[in-house]
């Protein structure tokens, strides 16, 4: 079996449910939190000060109030936007919040090493992971641009692996307690804010519903061989997700389909893909166009490789937008499905901590391919000359964005390994 080597710690799971719709992804998180009995553990790269984050925090607080013993959250220190007053109120309520890699004179390398994970685990039995951060734009609620993203709901034994990863990270030196000091008045205002958020939802005025009792495993076929991949907490210990991903790709015999919003292929992966092409394996990669991307600098990194990828024989497709693509997924040989936080770039390979959920199941792999195909319907193909099948090199892109991408090329020699 293809994953016999790559998935050494494979576990049986009951459910592997793809969450494409942003409202489903939000509702599933709400239901998991409200149904928790013993613990809620969450890891997030980004948490903004908006309705999504405040709703999540209000639900975490209420879970603690109703007696859930362990309610803990880790957020990357660089992308923590939760107000201090709210953090103080949560602390007083028994919700523990810590940050990953705060600024440290003793650890200067922490500045570029970030926790890019997005996971919420409940009772060590169920979890959601994928591309969505805690912010409105990832759940279809932003006033301007919303991301096109994907998560997966998993129920079963691999949740224990995810929970153990959380516990290891929580007790490591990489995570620090928050020191927040606010007045009683500010803390009371934060309490009122979270109360108001939940009251509006209880009145049916929100983007999600409370107390639905939804069983997200309902009518889902049982699957086997689910593995929760994660980078080691300490870089010197264990195998990185990049290594495990390369093992799975190395085992491909017919096809490799990858969807990555940021595509700056590390040299080892690029060489591996070119090797698989020579073996007759079909390789397709879906990524953002200059029009849809939210990151001009990584897009400049991709444009450097675009012609080489197409000329090598890779079927490169660029998502037209206008919304940015943010889903991180892959399907190998039409039977192995991968969904997680991992981008095809040097940062995910070497610097960030990442997670990925993998299952070998033809029906689910086809479901994921169908999801990717929906994005392909709004994508153009890149030809051997490094351009879409159009006269214009960068269709429907503003002049200002073209200029920014052109200028970004001059930074690539300095920052490419950190994209």
Language-model-derived ranges and their functions:
Residues 1-7:
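Sec-dependent N-terminal signal peptides
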Residues 7-117, 121-419:
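Charged, low-complexity intrinsically disordered terminal segments
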């Amino acid at each position: 079996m293809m994953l016999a080597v790559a998935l050494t710690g494979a576990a049986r799971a009951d459910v592997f449910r793809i969450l494409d719709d942003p409202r489903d992804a939000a509702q599933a998180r709400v239901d998991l939190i409200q149904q928790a009995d013993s613990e809620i553990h969450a890891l997030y790269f980004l948490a903004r000060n908006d309705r999504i984050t405040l709703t999540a925090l209000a639900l975490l607080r209420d879970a603690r109030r109703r007696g859930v013993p362990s309610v803990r959250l880790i957020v990357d220190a660089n992308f923590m936007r939760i107000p201090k007053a709210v953090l103080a109120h949560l602390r007083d309520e028994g919700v523990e919040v810590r940050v990953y890699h705060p600024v440290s004179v003793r650890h200067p390398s922490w500045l570029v090493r970030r926790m890019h994970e997005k996971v919420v685990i409940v009772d060590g039995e169920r979890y959601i992971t994928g591309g969505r951060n805690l912010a409105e734009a990832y759940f279809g609620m932003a006033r301007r641009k919303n991301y096109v993203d994907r998560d997966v709901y998993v129920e079963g034994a691999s949740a224990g692996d995810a929970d153990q990863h959380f516990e290891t990270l929580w007790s490591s030196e990489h995570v620090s307690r928050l020191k927040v000091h606010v007045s009683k008045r500010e803390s009371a205002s934060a309490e009122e804010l979270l109360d108001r958020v939940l009251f509006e939802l209880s009145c049916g005025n929100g983007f999600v519903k409370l107390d639905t009792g939804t069983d997200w495993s309902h009518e889902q076929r049982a699957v086997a061989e689910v593995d929760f991949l994660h980078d080691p907490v300490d870089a010197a210990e264990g195998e990185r997700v990049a290594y495990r991903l390369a093992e799975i790709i190395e085992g491909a015999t017919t096809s490799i389909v990858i969807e990555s919003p940021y595509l700056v292929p590390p040299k080892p992966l690029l060489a591996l893909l070119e090797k698989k092409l020579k073996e007759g394996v079909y390789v397709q990669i879906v990524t953002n166009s200059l029009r849809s991307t939210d990151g001009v600098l990584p897009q400049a990194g991709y444009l450097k490789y675009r012609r080489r990828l197409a000329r090598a024989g890779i079927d490169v497709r660029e998502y037209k937008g206008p919304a940015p693509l943010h889903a991180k997924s892959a399907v190998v040989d039409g039977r192995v499905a991968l969904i997680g936080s991992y981008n095809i770039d040097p940062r995910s390979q070497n610097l960030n901590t990442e997670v990925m959920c993998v299952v070998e199941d033809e029906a689910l792999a086809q479901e994921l391919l169908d999801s990717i195909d929906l994005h392909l319907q709004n994508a153009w193909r890149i030809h051997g000359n490094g351009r879409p099948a159009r006269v214009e090199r960068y269709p429907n892109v503003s002049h200002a964005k073209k200029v920014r991408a052109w200028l970004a090329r001059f930074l690539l020699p300095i920052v490419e390994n950190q994209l």
